[in-house]
């Protein structure tokens, strides 16, 4: 959504994202490719965490571990992606498995267990980057968790309604000045901001904004935000600097949807689960 305040922003361009398309070293191994931890997937929403985790794996993380927000994980493994390692969130947080970046909040729910999971993560994550999405943002807005997350990079990924909750504004006010809302969030939380929507805004912690021009209405379906959060966490886990990883993830997510539509998959009926394979193809292209 372009407004007078966003139409003049510089656009995110593929040629400005060399780290996304660099060749992988011949001596790479799963440890050198980064480990992503995903915290989410409360009752009835396990799919959200799995969408994020699958996307993280398919855009290049060496390992992806999932901590479900449940006392007992409802699944022993992901039958569609058995490479993912599933456990309950406490088991993951206490395992000390050398997580390089975290994606948290996808489908975690709004109950006390979810708030405890995120609070424990904020305390234990050390120097690992953090992507906070979905219910994680709603818990933050409600005061159920506190923004005590240290100096390592943090990325918040609100849609306009979530941004409004975080700022105490209406969705309409956020949409009327999307760059202003993104800058206000960056200043309030000392974080990178991805304000999602048509023409997503990426804002760094200092308030510099860019607009994304990739993507299409096929993304207007459940789970696409979880996929974006997984891509973001994965690129950060691969030790790509936030200056490349954050705009790069947003560009890649939209470009993956565009590539699917070009091949007749959508926009009507495009599903979130189809994005990760498309994003993988793009990362491996050199065009």
From Swiss-Prot:
Pfam (any one): Carb_kinase
Positions of the YjeF C-terminal domain: 13-286
Entry annotated with the keyword ATP-binding: yes
Organism name: Bordetella pertussis (strain Tohama I / ATCC BAA-589 / NCTC 13251)
Keywords: ATP-binding, Lyase, NAD, NADP, Nucleotide-binding
Biological function: Catalyzes the dehydration of the S-form of NAD(P)HX at the expense of ADP, which is converted to AMP. Together with NAD(P)HX epimerase, which catalyzes the epimerization of the S- and R-forms, the enzyme allows the repair of both epimers of NAD(P)HX, a damaged form of NAD(P)H that is a result of enzymatic or heat-dependent hydration.
Domain of life assignment: Bacteria
Binding-site positions, (6S)-NADPHX: 48, 109, 159, 226
Catalytic activity: (6S)-NADHX + ADP = AMP + phosphate + NADH + H(+); (6S)-NADPHX + ADP = AMP + phosphate + NADPH + H(+)
Residues at which AMP binds: 196-200, 225
GO biological process, one term: metabolite repair
Enzyme Commission number(s) from the entry: 4.2.1.136
Cofactor: Mg(2+)
Subunit structure: Homotetramer.
GO MF annotations in UniProt: ADP-dependent NAD(P)H-hydrate dehydratase activity; ATP binding; NAD(P)HX epimerase activity
Stretches that traverse the bilayer: none
Family membership: Belongs to the NnrD/CARKD family.
Name of the protein in question: ADP-dependent (S)-NAD(P)H-hydrate dehydratase
Matches recorded under InterPro entries: Carbohydrate_kinase_pred_CS, CARKD, Ribokinase-like
């Amino acid at each position: 959504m372009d407004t007078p305040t966003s139409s003049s922003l510089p656009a995110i361009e593929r040629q400005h994202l060399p780290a996304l398309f660099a060749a992988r070293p011949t001596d790479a191994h799963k440890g050198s490719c980064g480990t992503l931890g995903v915290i989410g997937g409360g009752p009835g929403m396990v799919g959200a965490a799995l969408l994020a985790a699958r996307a993280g794996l398919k855009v290049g993380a060496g390992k992806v571990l999932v901590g479900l927000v449940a006392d007992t994980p409802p699944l022993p493994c992901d039958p569609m992606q058995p490479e993912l390692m599933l456990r309950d969130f406490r088991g993951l947080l206490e395992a000390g498995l050398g997580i390089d970046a975290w994606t948290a909040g996808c489908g975690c729910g709004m109950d006390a267990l979810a708030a405890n999971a995120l609070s424990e993560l904020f305390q234990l994550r050390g120097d690992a980057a953090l992507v906070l999405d979905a219910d994680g943002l709603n818990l933050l807005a409600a005061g159920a968790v506190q923004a005590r997350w240290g100096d390592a990079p943090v990325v918040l990924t609100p849609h306009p309604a979530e941004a409004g909750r975080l700022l105490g504004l209406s969705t309409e006010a956020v949409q009327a000045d999307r760059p202003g809302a993104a800058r206000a969030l960056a200043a309030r939380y000392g974080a990178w901001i991805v304000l999602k929507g048509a023409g997503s805004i990426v804002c760094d912690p200092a308030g510099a904004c860019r607009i994304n021009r990739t993507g299409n209405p096929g993304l207007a379906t459940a789970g696409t935000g979880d996929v974006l959060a997984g891509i973001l966490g994965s690129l950060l886990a691969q030790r790509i600097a936030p200056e490349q990883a954050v705009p790069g993830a947003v560009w890649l997510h939209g470009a993956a949807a565009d590539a699917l539509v070009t091949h007749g998959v959508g926009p009507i009926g495009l599903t979130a689960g189809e994005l990760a394979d498309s994003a993988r193809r793009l990362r491996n292209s050199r065009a």
